[in-house]
């Protein structure tokens, strides 16, 4: 019996496995599982002997692998799954969504400008954020603020180690950066995977590292941040000096009354060889005209040779105050303009202004400002301006302005009235202010008077604003009567300027 068992065991090793599997297909469920788990099963089933001991031995041997298989499988697979999950979690936590290194001063200046488009009470939570976009290829960072009416894109150079985009809380970030010491800072954002969510980037942990410390805060996905409107209409290129002078000469006269929406902006008229800026609040009017050949360069009229119809648009004062700020404090954009011979080129400092119905953009240096335009018919300002005057008072602008600022301290805070007494005999103008229960003030200023004597009153704040808007050394006050508009104009200068003031009626 012993010999009979050993001989088949040795022969089983030479048996083809495929033949053994084919013979085992017709057997029971336990025999089928045993074949796939253990090599001993073919050794037991191979002998085709009449001995009944062989199948009796196969049953317990088949049961052994059934118990062993699940124990071995659970023991080997469990650590593998835990390690995989752990590695994936660590990888997600270390996933860098954005990382930049830059100067704290540059970041602070650029961020402060972008935040000027952030509304105090945004209509949507995402609008309380500034969109940060970092580009590895250009090594630049773009900050965007948008309140659905005014949008600002501000770009600066930085060392970008990881590109991407994220929305960060504008006020919080601006407050932090404004307090940082000068030096290098690192801004980074790390993506985290939400529980049970395979999409990275929905939860973002961010930090700002500087020489003496670090801060951490949260960002949100940029997907909901609205895109700034694209404006592809007519484009003109204004010399930066012309645009700045036009804004300086008109912005002060815009209305602050939101019920008169169209008067809260500056009305701009663009023609082939002229640009006009105008503003009024109903009590005063300011107009600036630039009529030199370099005032407007139009890409369409230059290419076609045709004369475009004048473009008229009313631009919100909020957007223009920002443009003025950038023009005064930052270098404006430069655009190459070819000479007529095509041989030489020179740099001309210009600002691109592009129009579409309801929208326009300003592009200068590293900044782009998007703004909606104001709807409504702007008043016909030219019919309000007198053509002739009976009296002219020529003043030294700075000394006259200083006198007005001194006596304005004692003017009545309710109406700010200053009374002018014009004396052509003495060639003197006397300014008088009075405030009940406070005091009074008087200044006598030597001037050059043409015409008869007259007493007239104005809002002294309007007089001061008018004198500040004129950049010349001397100015002329044009007057007809004490109940008709008076006008301040500069003497000299390349642009035409005027400020119209309505007199205040006084009782003797």
Regions found by a protein language model. Give the residues of each.
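Structural preference for solvent-exposed beta-strand-turn elements
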Residues: 2-33, 39-508
